[in-house]
From Swiss-Prot:
Keywords: Hydrolase, Manganese
Family indicated by similarity: Belongs to the metallo-dependent hydrolases superfamily. Adenine deaminase family.
One Pfam entry name: Amidohydro_1
Gene Ontology MF term list: adenine deaminase activity
Cofactor: Mn(2+)
Protein name: Adenine deaminase
Gene3D superfamilies: Metal-dependent hydrolases (3.20.20.140), Urease, subunit C, domain 1 (2.30.40.10)
GO biological process: one example: adenine catabolic process
Catalyzed reaction equations: adenine + H2O + H(+) = hypoxanthine + NH4(+)
Keyword Manganese appears in the UniProt entry: yes
Organism this protein belongs to: Staphylothermus marinus (strain ATCC 43588 / DSM 3639 / JCM 9404 / F1)
Length: 605
């Protein structure tokens, strides 16, 4: 673990804090007349003031002689009886899923009061390897948003020995050790390959051993694991999880000492199901917090980030202060930085959010590291852009563009009915269902059935130009246009394409190659929407407002023109290719039974 310098102990900085609060030196900023949310105790202190010196808080509370902290250069902010709370912390996020670079994400996250995130860049790591992680870390430095890094633990997501997919890169124990020595690392990213953990796979355990040696936090990914299997997973030295989707599952994990992150992202929303964990139990702050995991640019722009999750919790009846604790001191204690963040109090970094109301959090003034980033909704800070190497902008390599007929599964029977293994998706859930449906066969082709919401799907290797392509069917997407193709296909991020019309599927794939990554929607041979994502085929290098407008244009077209009411459509499609979340997935090698970590046939004989 090599924390950024801002977390280091600076004697001169500490002297300034002491001299400021004892009245020997004027403060840089004084915020007066606020209702101070005390996250350690769950109280609200009215008519409080916050004294800031440099990057840190010299003191916070009631002061009878406030003038003794004020000099001629002190900025005095009247809090106007607003609520002051710590900057929000997201303990687990994949920034790439926002479709934004660290620079673009920081602008939006800070607007909504987030001042610290722990990012697991395994998306770019899968595409560009440890080199991609290093580039991401470099881009994340020198931003007012503190972006701490979890080193990807599962690149690829499954053991290559299983042969489940064509992967671009491998981040092994040696790469983990190299990355652990870089400034900004705090943890080992979610250990997704729980099958290998339960099988005592030494290559996975070696990464965990490296993490423990470097005192990195080890993060988990244990969907539906219970009983002895969960014990075995924890025995490996993995201490957190954000995959709980039912209350009993989350409670068991908490009882066994796991840190439970309650996930409320764009595609999967687990807060409502896990509410009893907050409302019916007195679980210690250290073992419970909110996390977003994956959040898209539309939600960031329109609904917010951690403030959005806090507000949803309040709407569900959670006490506002408790909800704030789960986005501040809770995650701070999990990442062992509670002496720096998560509290508005002496010695802590001056990460402060002001909101007029506590029943509905709407940040209007955000201070990060003692610097005013937003003041009454207006951006006061310039964000420097990062120049990405050319190698990161050209990552889509196909052997050829598949012909339309190649997207249709073939069998040796000319006509008839067959039973197919189909992936059924559910809005708002990361899980899929393995369902068996009867499909018609015509001229040796197994046909999709749009009337039952069963469409064609394929995943194509886009890293090594092998020509490898897996075919299948998806049920439940509600997609009525001709085709959609995207280079976001967790976690290997091969090219995934789905649709009702094989000709449109081929056209969409061709366009993806031309723009070198992104999202393309085609209907009746025409491109009706596209969003270029040049950076690793995952992120746009444009400003967040531009990305939002282009993304919104596609979603509006699908909603208004084709009746698509699936809020998390793009992310749900991307997850179809992730062979570590039950029950069944599709890769460039074919259908995967996740629990067995084996390929299965598309058609049952």
């Amino acid at each position: 673990m090599v924390l950024p310098k801002i977390f280091s102990y600076d004697i001169d900085e500490r002297i300034n804090l002491i001299q400021t609060i004892t009245g020997k030196k004027p403060a840089d900023i004084v915020i007066s007349n606020v209702n101070l949310v005390l996250t350690p105790t769950g109280e609200i202190l009215d008519n409080a003031s916050i004294i800031i010196s440099g990057k840190r808080i010299a003191g916070a509370g009631k002061y009878s002689e406030l003038h003794r902290f004020i000099g001629k250069n002190t900025l005095v902010i009247d809090g106007e009886n607003n609520y002051a709370m710590p900057g929000f912390i997201d303990p687990h996020i994949h920034i790439e899923s926002s479709l934004l670079t660290p620079h673009g994400f920081a602008k939006l996250a800070l607007r909504h009061g987030t001042t610290t995130v722990v990012a697991d860049p395994h998306e770019i790591g899968n595409v560009l390897g440890s080199r991609g992680v290093e580039i991401f870390m470099d881009a994340a430095r020198n931003l007012p948003l503190k972006i701490l890094i979890d080193i990807p633990s599962c690149v690829p997501a499954t053991d290559p020995k299983f042969g489940l997919e064509t992967t671009a890169n491998i981040i092994g124990a040696d790469e983990v050790e190299k990355l652990a020595a870089l400034e900004g690392t705090i943890g080992l990213g979610e250990v997704m390959d729980f099958v290998s953990v339960l099988n005592s796979n030494k290559s996975v355990l070696e990464k965990i051993r490296v993490a423990h040696r470097y005192r990195l936090i080890v993060n988990g990914h244990a969907p539906l694991l219970r009983g002895a299997e969960l014990d075995a997973y924890i025995d490996a030295g993995i201490w957190s999880d954000h995959e709980s989707t039912i209350y009993e599952e989350a409670l068991e994990k908490a009882r066994k000492g796991m840190y439970v992150f309650i996930r409320e992202g764009s595609a999967w929303k687990d807060l409502k199901a896990l509410l009893p964990l907050i409302k019916n139990h007195t679980i210690d702050h250290r073992f419970l917090s909110f996390a977003s995991d994956d959040i898209n640019v539309v939600d960031l722009m329109e609904k917010g980030h951690m403030d959005r999750i806090i507000n949803i919790a309040i709407e569900y009846g959670v006490d506002p202060v408790k909800a704030i604790q789960l986005a501040t001191i809770g995650p701070a204690m999990r990442i062992h930085l509670e002496d720096h963040v998560g509290v508005v109090g002496p010695a802590r970094l001056a990460d402060i959010v002001l909101s007029k109301n506590i029943e509905y959090i709407k940040p209007h003034t955000v201070i990060a590291n003692g610097e005013i980033i937003y003041y009454k909704g207006e951006l006061k800070k310039t964000f420097n852009n990062y120049k990405y190497p050319e190698e990161t902008l050209n990552t889509v390599k196909l052997a050829k563009i598949p012909e339309p007929q190649e997207f249709i599964p073939k069998i040796n029977t000319r006509e008839g009915i067959v039973e197919a293994n189909i992936i059924e998706v559910t809005p708002g859930s990361a899980l899929t269902k393995h369902v068996i449906e009867e499909l018609a066969v015509k001229n040796y082709n197994v046909l999709a059935d749009p009337n039952r919401d069963i469409i064609y799907a394929a995943v194509i290797d886009r890293h090594k130009a092998t020509g490898s392509m897996g075919k299948g069917f998806i049920k439940g997407l509600g997609f009525r246009a001709g085709a959609i193709a995207q280079t976001i296909a967790h976690d290997t991020h091969n090219l995934i394409v789905a649709g009702n019309n094989p000709e449109d599927m081929s056209r969409a794939v061709k366009r993806i190659v031309e723009i070198q990554g992104g999202i393309v929607v085609v209907d009746e041979g025409k491109i009706i929407g596209e969003l270029p994502l040049r950076l690793a085929g995952l992120m746009s290098i444009e400003e967040p407002e531009t990305v939002y407008e282009k993304y919104k244009k596609i979603t509006n077209e699908l909603n208004n023109g084709y009746g698509l009411e699936f809020e998390s459509f793009f992310m749900t499609l991307a997850l179809v290719a992730l062979p570590v979340i039950p029950e069944i997935r599709l890769t460039d090698k074919g259908l995967v039974d996740v629990r067995k970590a084996k390929l299965i046939p598309l058609i049952n004989k």
